[in-house]
Amino acid sequence: MFRRAKGAIPMGSDVRHVRGEAQKELVKKFEVFLSNGRSRWQVWSDWITVSAIAVSNATDQSHFDEREKQYLSIAGKYTRPEMEAFTEMLALLVVALEDNPEQDFLGELYMYLGLGNDHSGQFFTPYHICEVMSAVTTPTEEFQQKIGDRGWVAVCDPTCGAGALLVAFANECRKKGINYQTNVLFVAQDIDYIVGMMCYLQMSLLGMPGYVVIGDTLASPSVSYDKRGLLPVDKGNVWYTPMLRTPVWQYRIFMAQMELVTQPIRKERVADAPKSEPQKSPEALKKLEKPKNTEKPKAAKRPQRAPEQEPVFSEGKGGQLSFF
């Protein structure tokens, strides 16, 4: 248990409305920064960013240099005791999620601190609603059959926010006896950098294998070199969780890479080319001419997708989540 600090809260917030001792202690540490004239958004965004970079750089060497520069740039704005306070806040986040993994800790705290109104007018779906959505989404028999046939299944939230829906889905898998750490690949995307980092932190600390893509889902949706999402197109905007670096997932990534390398290159065959026909006389060509059609052309029918291109589960079954 954490002891409550004595004294008044700087910004007049009522910590009694925050659940759990870890949450209350984190809010108190957070608001100490505000007494130094910093805005809530600046402190929150800096803490989330340096925490996400610390987690990422521990396992992801491909983006280490760039993100380390960003970390040092932010750290230069704070004193050493303040950076230590950031570390303590991250430790409180770890404790809170260990104590109760069935929550959207950062999303709820984000809304409690009023940051949703200050930044883009965002509003996160409450976690208990996400629980209901996940319970309806997870088709136990079909889902487990796909895992049995393919070894694992990928789930994607194209507008992840702080990751509440994916967290709820992971907890729903656990309740139904599905080991999400080895059987589910979590793919998240959000246009908001800080919100995406909140999702990344929660996914990482809860041991969810996958990655978060920062970008506009409509303009630049997350795409992958392979069909199952193991090899995302990475333009520096992909954040891989530490669990994705475990042997079981590294083996799957390696096999996906080998499959791409060993795929045969399709060559045009002469037999498939259209055969030339003997030249026809002008009289014969006139007979072949079609009469002019005065009717308006009808709209072309939409071609049906080949069976192999159909998704494993339709988006209608998964709602906001999609499976592949």
List the predicted regions and their residue ranges.
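Detector for methionine-enriched segments
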Residues: 1, 11, 83, 89, ...
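Intrinsically disordered, low-structural-confidence terminal and linker regions
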Residues: 1-18, 298-324
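Class I S-adenosyl-L-methionine
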Residues: 6-159, 163-177, 321-324
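Residue-identity detector for glutamine
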Residues: 23, 42, 61, 70, ...
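Generic preference for hydrophobic/aromatic residues in regular secondary structure cores
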Residues: 28-31, 184, 238-239
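Sequence-level detector for tyrosine residue identity
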Residues: 71, 78, 110-112, 127, ...
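Conserved S-adenosyl-L-methionine
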Residues: 129-234
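S-adenosylmethionine
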Residues: 202-319
